[in-house]
Design a protein with these regions (language model features):
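Short, well-structured N-terminal submotif of metal-dependent ribonuclease cores
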Residues: 1-39, 52-66
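Short beta-strand scaffold positions
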Residues: 4, 38-39, 80, 104, ...
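A generic structural signal for short hydrophobic patches within well-formed alpha-helices
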Residues: 9, 44, 128-129
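Ribonuclease/tRNase effector modules and their secretory precursors
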Residues: 21-22, 70, 75-78, 122, ...
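Active-site neighborhoods of divalent-metal-dependent phosphate/nucleic-acid chemistry enzymes
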Residues: 76-120
């Protein structure tokens, strides 16, 4: 099982990203192995916003369509943040006083990963390392 965060999705689609080739190769390998990929609605919110902000419209639109196809084909699972998970993420926010830069979306991702027992994540964020 693999969780992909916003950075992973953006780097996969943006050829200008320094790690684009590495991420694309890794993603294709996971696909070949029929690995299950997870993300959340919060991650996709960030991803869709940034795709259309950073990339030409046609590339951003194709990216969203590919994500939708992955969901329809059962390759990508979207975990929808529940009110309970939202509350748990709020508790984490209060707990990690020493990490003011961690986003609330990242905290919800941590909650979901813990629930699903996912240990592998495609990210550049230090808090997941």
């Amino acid at each position: 099982m693999l969780f992909i965060d916003t950075w992973g999705w953006l780097t996969l689609r943006d050829r200008r990203e320094a790690r684009h080739k590495d991420v694309k190769t890794f993603y294709q390998e996971v696909q070949k192995q029929k690995g299950r990929i997870y993300t959340t609605d919060y991650v996709l919110d960030e991803t869709y916003t940034l795709l259309f902000k950073r990339l030409p419209y046609s590339v951003a639109r194709e990216s969203v369509e590919r994500l939708n196809e992955a969901v329809l084909n059962g390759y990508l699972a979207i975990e929808w943040i529940t009110p309970e998970q939202f509350e748990e993420a709020k508790k984490l926010r209060m707990k990690y006083q020493d990490k003011p830069r961690i986003s609330f979306t990242d905290l919800t991702s941590i909650v979901v990963m813990n629930k699903l027992k996912i240990v592998n994540i495609l990210t550049e964020d230090a808090q997941f390392i």
